[in-house]
Regions:
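C-terminal nucleotide
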Residues: 1-86, 101-132
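Short beta-strand->loop micro-motif that forms the acidic, two-metal-ion catalytic signature
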Residues: 95-101
Length: 132
């Protein structure tokens, strides 16, 4: 049995409730996304890496159910900001922080634009950390 076959069997195990099935699906698909993201970074394919970030967030939101409406709003707003390839929830879930993959030359401006859009949309302040 190959690894993908074993993963699919784990997802489809008849003993799993619907909730547990979604949790297993997230873990299996997230492991695949991590491997694909490493490959995308090695190939300097930031568009692909951004797509994988967005898919990761969708899985965290829908399958693992650890996102919040505020974080989901922030991720949606990020999709409209030029220079941001993708964004996802990070940390333990249930709010807190996102990590965004952005063009280096636009990172600070993109982060400020995102925080301003979030503040204007929700009334909540945001804090940005842009690595040097």
């Amino acid at each position: 049995m190959t690894r993908p076959d074993a993963d699919e069997r784990a997802i489809q195990a008849p003993v799993l409730s619907d909730v547990l099935r979604r949790r297993v699906r997230h873990v299996v698909s997230e492991n695949r996304r991590v491997i694909e993201t490493v490959s995308a970074f090695k190939n300097h394919d930031l568009d692909k890496a951004g797509e994988l970030f967005r898919a990761s967030h969708a899985s965290l939101r829908d399958d693992f159910e650890v996102s919040t409406s505020e974080i989901d709003k922030l991720c949606l707003l990020a999709e409209r900001v030029q220079g941001i390839y993708g964004v996802r929830l990070t940390g333990g879930g249930f709010g807190g922080a996102v990590v965004a993959l952005a063009e280096a030359r636009r990172a600070r401006a993109a982060a400020e634009e995102l925080v301003n859009a979030y503040r204007n949309t929700t009334g909540h302040p945001g804090t940005v950390v842009v690595p040097a």
